[in-house]
From Swiss-Prot:
GO terms for biological process: protein deneddylation; response to iron ion starvation. Belongs to the peptidase M67A family. CSN6 subfamily. The lineage of its organism: Eukaryota, Viridiplantae, Streptophyta, Embryophyta, Tracheophyta. GO terms for cellular component: COP9 signalosome. It comes from Oryza sativa subsp. japonica. Component of the COP9 signalosome complex (CSN), a complex involved in various cellular and developmental processes such as photomorphogenesis and response to hormones. The CSN complex is an essential regulator of the ubiquitin (Ubl) conjugation pathway by mediating the deneddylation of the cullin subunits of SCF-type E3 ligase complexes, leading to decrease the Ubl ligase activity of SCF. Involved in early response to iron deficiency. Component of the CSN complex, probably composed of CSN1, CSN2, CSN3, CSN4, CSN5, CSN6, CSN7 and CSN8. PROSITE patterns: MPN. Induction: Down-regulated during the early stage of iron deficiency (at protein level). This is COP9 signalosome complex subunit 6. PANTHER family: COP9 SIGNALOSOME COMPLEX SUBUNIT 6, EUKARYOTIC TRANSLATION INITIATION FACTOR 3 SUBUNIT F-RELATED. Residues 44-175 form the MPN domain. One of its GO terms (molecular function) is metallopeptidase activity.
Length: 329
């Protein structure tokens, strides 16, 4: 998924925080979902804490606006490819707008011990637009990375927007009014995932409240996803079939190009009537029935063993009581 190519985000040019349409550096950015999850979680926690405290600690919270959060993004750069893997939070002085350098260096050192190949690539924040004060924070990180990136997450919910509310900016030196100034320019990015991230994100996306049942299990979520995919495939096939029937009856004009595409699509599907398919299908079907039968048989055996053990324990206690009473008499 690429970043949205919106118009330029304009800010005060004297602050050096104007955002041009697109970057000209030629770098390729790959963003991992863990970063988006971390930034979203950071914003949600700070917003919830501000709502619970109700003391109006920050001016943003006091004005009814969601508070901004700040942090660093880390990853690797291989040639012209920048891959952002993870992130961590930063402490910002709300009065002076400066970063806590001691906290930043400590966090950087700790992450270096766990991820020795990861470097600080830039920083992140939340909001709908680039602000004038963002360039001040951006310049403060240039002693760690001479060309840091700025990741901006918009926490506002926009149901009509299909793209991710995430924008990545680079800084470029432009001559404005005869003087060189740093400005933010948009950079395109793609979402890159590894197997562990795909499993985690899929689990979070299908997570349901635990009510003692099995609906929230991973198997149920997996089967639900397969069912939705098959249902969608079935609806698309029905649309194609209805269109072909209408074309055959003469209700729709003949489209040879579309017929070639349908023919190519049909050829990709496996031959469902072949003898080998029937043999393999019956073999897997019988194996599944056998596994189900063995599971039921094992469950019944376990239940029977528990019943026998309870019966023996009850019988032994009853025999002991009768034997003790006879010996006493």
């Amino acid at each position: 998924m690429s970043a949205p190519s919106d118009p330029a985000v304009a800010t005060h040019p004297q602050a050096g925080a104007a955002a041009a349409a697109s970057s000209s550096s030629g770098l390729t950015f790959k963003l991992h979902p863990l970063v988006i999850v971390n930034v979203s979680d950071h914003h949600t926690r700070v917003k919830a804490q501000a709502a619970c405290s109700g003391d109006g600690a920050s001016s943003a919270a006091a004005g009814g606006q969601p508070p901004r959060v700040f942090g660093c993004v880390i990853g690797v750069q291989r040639g012209r490819t920048v891959e952002i893997f993870n992130s961590f939070e930063l402490v910002l002085d709300p009065v002076s707008g400066t970063l806590d350098r001691a906290f930043l260096e400590k966090k950087q050192e700790l992450y270096k011990k766990v991820f020795p190949d990861f470097y600080v690539l830039g920083w992140y924040s939340t909001g709908s637009d680039v602000r004038d004060t963002d360039m001040q924070i951006h310049k403060a990180l240039m002693d760690i990375n001479e060309s840091p990136v700025y990741l901006l997450l918009n926490p506002a919910i926009n149901l009509s927007q299909k793209d991710l509310p995430v924008t990545i900016y680079e800084s470029e030196l432009h001559v404005i009014d005869g003087s060189p100034q740093l400005i933010f320019v948009r950079a395109n990015y793609t979402i890159e995932t590894v197997e562990a991230e795909r499993i985690s994100v899929d689990h979070v996306a299908h997570l349901k409240p635990s009510d003692g049942g099995s609906a929230a299990t991973q198997l149920a979520a997996h089967l639900t996803g397969i069912h939705s995919a098959i249902k969608m495939l079935n609806s698309r096939v029905r649309v194609i079939h209805q269109y072909l029937v209408s074309m055959q009856k003469g209700d729709m004009p003949l489209d040879n190009s579309l017929l070639r595409q349908v023919s190519s699509l049909v050829r990709r599907l496996p031959a469902m009537e072949s003898e080998k398919f029937q043999d393999d299908f019956l073999m897997e079907y019988n194996d599944t029935l056998l596994m189900t039968y063995l599971a039921m048989f094992t469950n019944c055996s376990s239940t029977m063993n528990e019943l026998v053990e309870k019966f023996n324990a009850t019988y032994e206690r009853s025999t002991a009581r009768r034997g003790g009473r006879g010996a006493f008499m």
